[in-house]
Amino acid sequence: MPMKGRFPIRRTLQYLSQGNVVFKDSVKVMTVNYNTHGELGEGARKFVFFNIPQIQYKNPWVQIMMFKNMTPSPFLRFYLDSGEQVLVDVETKSNKEIMEHIRKILGKNEETLREEEEEKKQLSHPANFGPRKYCLRECICEVEGQVPCPSLVPLPKEMRGKYKAALKADAQD
């Protein structure tokens, strides 16, 4: 993507991954109500401009809606899966204060994030085998240098049980 437009750095992967707000699983929808003019909504405008892309990147399951110039004072509203609504007043707050406040009330804590990261690392370990949903490889035959699956390529006679049993039977006779 070309580096054109206002603050194209906002669209870089490094900038998007720097966001530190990962919502709890119960957050489903986030609405941002703000005004494009006025002194009191400056923090909300900067929040929308700089921080919403980071939140979208870190929380792809959350629907984010923006409402411009429809309210006298800027606020955020979160809809949870239990049907509850959380209202956050952002009038007179800076975009950093808004991010910190959201992270504190609806974000996952550091311990939970660390546990999830550790779990993800364990699941993606190359030595684990199982269904694709949980592991990188389904079978040992996918590893280079290993014997291929008998269903794909027949095994040599020396490696088959029937052949070995027949050899033993012939040797005993």
From Swiss-Prot:
Compartments in which it is found: Mitochondrion
GO cellular component entries: mitochondrial inner membrane; mitochondrial small ribosomal subunit; mitochondrion
GO BP annotation list: mitochondrial translation
SMART domains, A to Z: L51_S25_CI-B8
GO MF, one annotated term: structural constituent of ribosome
PANTHER family noted in UniProt: MITOCHONDRIAL RIBOSOMAL PROTEIN S25, SMALL RIBOSOMAL SUBUNIT PROTEIN MS25
Sequence similarity: Belongs to the mitochondrion-specific ribosomal protein mS25 family.
Full protein name: Small ribosomal subunit protein mS25
Source species of the chain: Homo sapiens
Classification of source organism: Eukaryota, Metazoa, Chordata, Craniata, Vertebrata
Gene name linked to the record: MRPS25
